[in-house]
From Swiss-Prot:
SUPFAM superfamilies (UniProt xref): Ribosomal protein L22
Species of the source: Cuscuta obtusiflora (Peruvian dodder)
Family from the record: Belongs to the universal ribosomal protein uL22 family.
GO biological process: translation
Cross-referenced HAMAP family: Ribosomal_uL22_B
Protein name: Large ribosomal subunit protein uL22c
PANTHER family: CHLOROPLAST 50S RIBOSOMAL PROTEIN L22-RELATED, LARGE RIBOSOMAL SUBUNIT PROTEIN UL22M
Keywords from the named record: Plastid, Ribonucleoprotein, Ribosomal protein, RNA-binding, rRNA-binding
Entry keyword rRNA-binding: yes
GO cellular component: large ribosomal subunit; plastid
Subunit structure: Part of the 50S ribosomal subunit.
Subcellular location(s) of the protein: Plastid
Pfam families, per the entry: Ribosomal_L22
Length: 147
């Protein structure tokens, strides 16, 4: 096996124009899952935040494949978080020279993908490697898959 420098790849989004609660609703469903499982879940979710988060996961996967020799089927989401940002404040012009304030909620999104094959030191047969990857993936998720 080739020695990889980093088992993790990142995707960041700052000032994402959606409230943190709406983005957390989607992020909580994909945290700790494999890359392929995440794509299926995000394609089927009916929320507005699902498509941009799907793009961020794909960006992180392409970062992983370009910076190291990791395969997409060995990736899983090790960290996914949403942080609030102060609201963007605007004024909407109204009739008779008045204006109403508008607050647009925004958030920061961070997604980290980890390569499971990085933790194997010896070369194993393909069937054994798949079984070992599955066992390691299940051990890393543990009993709770939320956080």
């Amino acid at each position: 096996m080739t020695k990889k420098t980093k088992p993790e790849s990142y995707a960041f989004s700052q000032n994402f124009p959606i409230s943190a609660d709406k983005a957390r609703r989607v992020i909580d469903r994909i945290r700790g899952r494999s890359y392929e499982e995440t794509l299926i879940i995000l394609e089927l979710l009916p929320y507005r935040a699902a498509y941009p988060i799907l793009k961020f996961v794909c960006f992180a996967a392409s970062n992983a494949s370009s910076t190291s020799t990791s395969k997409k089927e060995n990736l899983f989401i090790s960290k996914a978080e949403v942080n609030e940002r102060p609201a963007i404040k605007k004024l909407k012009p109204r009739a008779r020279g008045r204006s109403f304030p508008i607050k647009k909620a925004t958030c920061h999104i961070t997604i980290v993908l980890t390569d499971l094959s990085f933790y194997f030191n010896e070369l194993v047969e393909p069937q054994q490697e798949k079984n070992l990857l599955t066992k390691l993936y299940l051990n890393l998720r543990g009993l709770w898959d939320k956080k």
